[in-house]
Amino acid sequence: MHLSTVSQILALFTAVASSAPTSHAAVRARHVSPPEADLLHVVKRGDDTDFSDWQRYSLWNKRVEALSRNPELVSRYGYKCNSCGKGRMDENGMRRHIMFDHYSKDIPLEKSAHVNKYIEFRNKGG
């Protein structure tokens, strides 16, 4: 590589870096918080092949916890209860919510066996 090529590449990187917004608000507006972004990346892309079974299980639980606290991600990748509107990231979590929060309250016993009727699946994401 010639010196002029290296200086051109450095100039390009400098121009790109200086054009990017530097405020923290702009960064937060574009990205979800780092732990949630990392977990979402691993699970969505299936990049967990380097993990042991226990690490994979632990990662899955952390993902469900982290994403369940983020309403925007629940609405994109999760399940929404048609009865009360609460969201859960996984189907089993939604089934538990319905059985424990709505059982004998506002969903009659005979209908609680047909939980799928009360779950709206949302999959707008990748």
From Swiss-Prot:
Gene Ontology CC: one annotated term: host cell nucleus
Lyase in keyword set: no
Induction and repression of expression: Expressed during multiple stages of host plant infection, including the prepenetration, early biotrophy, late biotrophy, transition and necrotrophy.
InterPro entries cross-referenced by the UniProt entry: Znf_C2H2_type (IPR013087)
Zinc-finger ranges (C2H2-type): 79-102
GO MF entry, a single one: zinc ion binding
Subcellular locations according to the entry: Secreted; Host nucleus
Keywords for this protein: Host nucleus, Metal-binding, Secreted, Signal, Transcription, Transcription regulation, Virulence, Zinc, Zinc-finger
The organism's place on the tree of life at top rank: Eukaryota
PROSITE patterns per record: ZINC_FINGER_C2H2_2
Major subcellular site: secreted
Signal peptide region: 1-19
Function: Probable secreted effector that translocates into the nuclei of host cells to reprogram the expression of targeted genes by binding on effector binding elements in rice.
Name recorded for this polypeptide: Host transcription reprogramming factor 3
Organism from which the protein derives: Pyricularia oryzae (strain 70-15 / ATCC MYA-4617 / FGSC 8958)
Phylogenetic classification of the source organism: Eukaryota, Fungi, Dikarya, Ascomycota, Pezizomycotina
